[in-house]
């Protein structure tokens, strides 16, 4: 797990990531074929996350093969029901 201020240290792997607030609540879930690139090339939720939660936010991840990303993201999002995900997808 890394603070959102240390995006340059994210791994260059495919996987699911969770964004957690200062209290450890999952506020956003996503997937990427390259987690490092997703966040360091301007993630579409970054400004919203910082505006609402400040910089005391953390990113945690799990390495997942590319072929399993959609299913893993759907299951993770359904489990946590994070505030910043626009909709909670069904588990498939």
Report residues per predicted region.
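Short, surface-exposed loop and linker segments with low hydrophobicity and enrichment for Pro/Ser/Thr
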Residues: 10-12, 46-55
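Coupling/hinge elements of helicase-like and P-loop NTPase modules
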Residues: 82-92
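Basic nucleic-acid-binding interfaces
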Residues: 50-66, 70
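GIY-YIG nuclease catalytic motif and its immediate N-terminal context
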Residues: 1-33, 37, 64-75
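Basic, amphipathic alpha-helical patches used to engage nucleic acids or provide basic targeting signals
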Residues: 39-47
């Amino acid at each position: 797990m890394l603070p959102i201020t240390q995006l340059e240290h994210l791994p260059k792997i495919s996987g699911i990531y969770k964004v957690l607030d200062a209290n450890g609540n999952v506020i956003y879930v996503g997937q990427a074929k390259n987690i490092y690139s997703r966040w360091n090339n301007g993630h579409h939720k970054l400004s919203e996350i910082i505006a609402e939660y400040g910089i005391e936010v953390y990113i945690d991840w799990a390495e997942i093969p590319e072929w399993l990303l959609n299913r893993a993201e759907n299951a993770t999002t359904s489990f946590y029901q994070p505030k910043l995900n626009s909709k909670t997808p069904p588990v498939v």
